[in-house]
Amino acid sequence: MPEIDARLREDVHQLGELLGDTIREQYGPAFLDKIERIRKGAKAARRGSAEGAQQLTATLDGLEESELLPVARAFNQFLNLANIAEQYHRIRRRRPNEPEPFENLALEELLGRLKDAGHAPGQLARQLAGLEIELVLTAHPTEVARRTLIQKYDAITAQLATKDHADLLPEERSRIQRRLQRLVAEVWHTDEIRKVRPTPVDEAKWGFAVIEHSLWEALPNVLRHVDEVLLRSTGERLPLSAAPLRFASWMGGDRDGNPNVTAGVTREVLLLARWMAADLYLRDIDRLAAELSMQEASPALLARVGDSAEPYRALLKQLRERLRLTRSWTHQALAGEVPAAEGVLEHNRDLVEPLQLCHESLHACGMGVIADGALLDCLRRAATFGLFLVRLDVRQDAGRHAAALSEITEYLELGSYAEWDEKTRLEFLLEELNSRRPLLPAHYQPSAETAEVLATCRAIAAAPPASLGSYVISMAGQPSDVLAVQLLLKESGVDWPMRVVPLFETLDDLDNAGPCMERLLTLPGYRSRLSGVQEVMIGYSDSAKDAGTLTAAWAQYRAQEKLVEICRHHEVELLLFHGRGGTVGRGGGPAHAAILSQPPGSVAGRFRVTEQGEMIRFKFGLPDIAEQNLNLYLAAVLEATLMPPPAPEPAWRAQMDRLAKDALHAYRRVVRDDPQFVEYFRLATPEQELGRLPLGSRPAKRREGGVESLRAIPWIFAWTQTRLMLPAWLGWETALLNAIERGEGALLGQMRERWPFFTTRIDMLEMVLAKADADIARLYDERLVPLELRPLGRRLRDLLSQAVRVVLGLTGQSLLLAHASETRESISVRNSYLDPLHLLQAELLARSRRCRGDACGGLEQALLVTVAGIAAGLRNTG
């Protein structure tokens, strides 16, 4: 087994030592010895030592009540420090003989393959410049780490980078060491659990901070890399106006199931984004004004600024004044309705035009090397982020729109919209959409719920169109769901064609997505209300919770194929929006592989996807890592567009139909049909306690009820904590075994080798099974589950073992992840720190369920720390 890189080991060891020193300083050497005994016992137990297992449990059992929290914190913080070291290792300085990372080479290598396949250089340059990739940042409540700590973690990363030079003087090394010691101590003495739930505005500010501290720097670097690669490969440059990557957000716009996101919140977040954008551009302009001290300028520039000794500075000064005015106005508008003063920047062209004039002038005067420095970076940012930083999506449940329209139709004595069939609804909606008179009389007084729906639509009408993305309708199922929103927007004064996007997210809705869109596109007048593309969102989380990951994945694939076919037939351009989570159970996984496994024709130069919770930090939290991931997105979308995977063969389709049918039956037999399942789930996992964790602004439950009432995130998060990982694999074990017993093993092998969709699914399944651990899950059962429910736990663990056996048989390996030994080694190293947290968590859950009143405070804090630690150790929470 190849060892983890020695430099990574050294960083992890050093940070661990510094944490140990900090703990010894506060609690003394005897306490640190206990932590070491726990760690060594866990490590030995993992190697099969009964003595080690005994040492682990004896030391944990012997802990005083007052020691539970610091022990949990110690293992939690070690895992966070290991994550920092691992993340830095991905971007550390390369030694002279080391190859460049795959992410940096992917685009150039792809352009070479595309040219070899017959694509003309000019066509490749146009295609790459015209890509439309939009990453939608969402605040799903899986970002366990606090913002305060994230900033300290980033400072530790910076020190690791400073240390990574062979030519440091001894005093420089000791200065770095002291700074690291201070930072680790700051981390240790900072409470890692938020005391209060973040508001939607807090979440939006967190998203803006990722842009400010990482993406603002990463984006121009990525486009500079694209420009250089294009020039080498095709002889052409990336146009200044090209924005192949853009960013949108749901933070402050996603009100589905979140009563805290109101129309007022949406307005506030839109203004905050404008304030942040103006502030970031002002920093850029200050730097440019210092740099561009040249005198020689083009006639066009001189005509704008008159007789000036420093024409570039004169023009930038005008832009700076307008940016200051814009920032000042947004600040005032946050306190109350204030009309925009003259000079406030309203259109992106007002920002871009003076910058472009400077760029053209410098090139015309033989100063291209200056033009293509910081000024070009600022132009790239202006094309990508614009004046509004991100485009804000709005999302609401279809039921809320239907309820609002019902109230309106009843008030107008037209009957109850909710009780009408689809045909009647469509007739009413089409008539109202085409009518010139308003639907609502001026004196109409709606209920609070309807007033909020209408206020949201009015907030959209009041916002600049360029600041908004799409209006997403969750739980959409019928054409009327889309027209209902179009009517409410029209009624509220939205006079531009906002994209209204149905989100198909249950198994039935995915199966019905094609017929629904077919009907919609043939409705009279619908096409004329379309703004360019038809966007459709595919939900990964809820469909997987509804049907299991295998059946859901096949339904998502078929729905996309059908939508591609229908839009092609109607000559409408399709944009698919992928609502993926961070975990496999919610459609997560490496983006590069996921994009290349989409159905042929479904990408076509456009790709929109959610980036969620903790995955935003792991993928985009540091500029260098953000660059790697953005490079991968560009290469994958270009490849999926110009070299799409083959269409599945009929035999593969038939096999997927059989697998999906068997998997659905097996999944629902457990999750829906077993009368003990919901009670077992609530007792064997920390599901109830997760609701008390102040993670995101959204409640964890939709309403009272069984599994279907749970949001997809706590559903996954709870099973991850106990290492059963049930949602990610349940159904696969039965479907694959049935196929093998029918003699279809060779066909499965062929699908795995030749069909990217199936390959990616099996790879993701293998990764999840490598992180799952039946022994840990059993410990939770023994501590928390009454005797009468334990047979169900045993059965689920048997199914997990069956899944492992079947996957090993299919991949021809004796060990999971045998082909990815570094990943296996990383999981194995983490287990020594995770195992004590799991044991502690099971014990704390048992105690907290017995205790009442004030005595629970300390237990609860320790319990929440174990939740955060396990999430950090497994690197994908929900």
From Swiss-Prot:
Catalyzed chemical reaction(s):
oxaloacetate + phosphate = phosphoenolpyruvate + hydrogencarbonate
What's the EC number here? 4.1.1.31
Listed GO MF terms: magnesium ion binding; phosphoenolpyruvate carboxylase activity
**InterPro entries annotated for this entry?**
PEP_COase (IPR021135), PEP_COase_bac/pln-type (IPR022805), PEP_COase_Lys_AS (IPR018129), PEPCASE_His_AS (IPR033129), Pyrv/PenolPyrv_kinase-like_dom (IPR015813)
Q: Which domain of life is it from?
A: Bacteria
Any one biological process term the GO annotation gives: oxaloacetate metabolic process
What are the alphabetically sorted keywords of the record? Carbon dioxide fixation, Lyase, Magnesium
Q: What class of enzyme is it?
A: lyase
State which residue ranges cross the membrane: none
Q: Which family does it belong to?
A: Belongs to the PEPCase type 1 family.
Instruction: Outline what the protein does.
Output: Forms oxaloacetate, a four-carbon dicarboxylic acid source for the tricarboxylic acid cycle.
> Know the name of this protein?
Phosphoenolpyruvate carboxylase
